[in-house]
Amino acid sequence: MKSSIDILPDGSITTPKGFKAGAIYAGIKKKSKNNLDLAILYSDTPCIAAGIFTTNKFRAAPVYISEHNLGFTDNRAIVVNSGCANAGTGEAGMADAIEMVKATAESLNMQPKDVLIASTGVIGHRLPIDKIKENVRLIGLSQRNGHEFARAIMTTDTRSKEIAVQVNIEGFQFYIAGAAKGAGMIHPNMATMLGFITTDASVSKEFLQFALKEAADVSFNMITVDGDTSTNDSLFMLSNGQAENPTFAGNTEYSLVFQQALTIVCQNLAKSIARDGEGAKRLIEIQVEGAANLEDARLIARVIAGSPLVKTAVHGADPNWGRILAAAGRAGADFDIDMVDLYLGESPVLLKGARTGVDEKELSSWLRQVEVIIKLNLNLGQGKAAAWGCDLSAEYVKINADYTT
């Protein structure tokens, strides 16, 4: 079977057929050069929807509502605000989220159950619900507004994060696209910060949820900036079927290509989040192979990527690779140190548990790259995984010390 997956140079969340978006400044966050803080993603036709949400016990109101509405069919829209998380706001916050969904549904002439919702921003503050209800009705929807949607969901992000791919499989074509936000409080578990995926492919609901979970497990669930999991983490996917392909379901050749394309989209967005970590200068990729199993490989990769000592060493271009081994050793997975190989880029610093004597000045120079790849081979089994993080700088401390002041 012939197939191709191509990343489009100017793709956005509205690249798939039938999707529109719009954004406006509603006064939720302080005025800035990016004067957008309220957005809608919309499909011309009803969608099959899937979602994955935060495992943080301190969940925000919009998470509960979206999880509930995903239980219905025909979801068609997602309303998103930035600047206020609507978490830690009690019954009043839940009422505000419900009002936000109702106002959006009325403006789009649909039922509230058809609308999903997401919020991001400062915890513990009420939404300015009157401003939101007034402005959500003014949002103009267009296929051209995908980039505006990606900008409107940003908080401390320094750049928008979006991608679209075109997939061709033996005579038919479809698109998968995505937008995400996140730069701090990034340590997801079964979710991401905020992520939105669209496709015009026809997909069964069961397979869509399965495929999204599979893609998240090798992308959003493998990134870390600071070890904190948000109260609002949500990942949504909408499929409107306008590509009119044979419906993807189960383990078929077609569905495997769909899964591959979805994984490309999710990994691209996840790496963009890690690369844009608050105050970060470098993207760190941890590659673990030779683990006893997949779970051990993922565990070790995530612990190394999240280690403050590893992150600060990379920031300072300090080739103190003992920190990498120490992080791997505390991950809780079994391995034999006398079998371990460790590479910084292509340079072996440890082979079969013994130091190789690579010149540290050369390593320090290499660590100044914008993308740093660390490879650990346990030489024990077939387990293999990758995780992504970023360096930890003084700027991260400054951003978060002054976040609300």
From Swiss-Prot:
MF annotations from Gene Ontology: glutamate N-acetyltransferase activity; L-glutamate N-acetyltransferase activity
Site positions per UniProt: Cleavage: A191, T192
Binding residue positions for substrate: T155, K181, T192, E278, N400, T405
CDD domains, per database record: OAT (cd02152)
Keywords carried by this UniProt record: Acyltransferase, Amino-acid biosynthesis, Arginine biosynthesis, Autocatalytic cleavage, Cytoplasm, Multifunctional enzyme, Transferase
Catalysed reactions, semicolon-separated: N(2)-acetyl-L-ornithine + L-glutamate = N-acetyl-L-glutamate + L-ornithine; L-glutamate + acetyl-CoA = N-acetyl-L-glutamate + CoA + H(+)
Subcellular locations according to the entry: Cytoplasm
GO biological process terms held by the UniProt record: L-arginine biosynthetic process; ornithine biosynthetic process
Residues of the site described as Involved in the stabilization of negative charge on the oxyanion by the formation of the oxyanion hole: T120, G121
Pfam family, one: ArgJ
Keyword ATP-binding: no
Active site: T192
Family annotation (Gene3D superfamilies): ArgJ beta chain, C-terminal domain (3.10.20.340), L-amino peptidase D-ALA esterase/amidase (3.60.70.12)
GO cellular component: cytoplasm
Keyword Cell division: no
InterPro entries: Arg_biosynth_ArgJ (IPR002813), ArgJ-like_dom_sf (IPR016117), ArgJ_beta_C (IPR042195)
Family assignment from sequence similarity: Belongs to the ArgJ family.
Subunit structure: Heterotetramer of two alpha and two beta chains.
Name the UniProt record assigns to this protein: Arginine biosynthesis bifunctional protein ArgJ
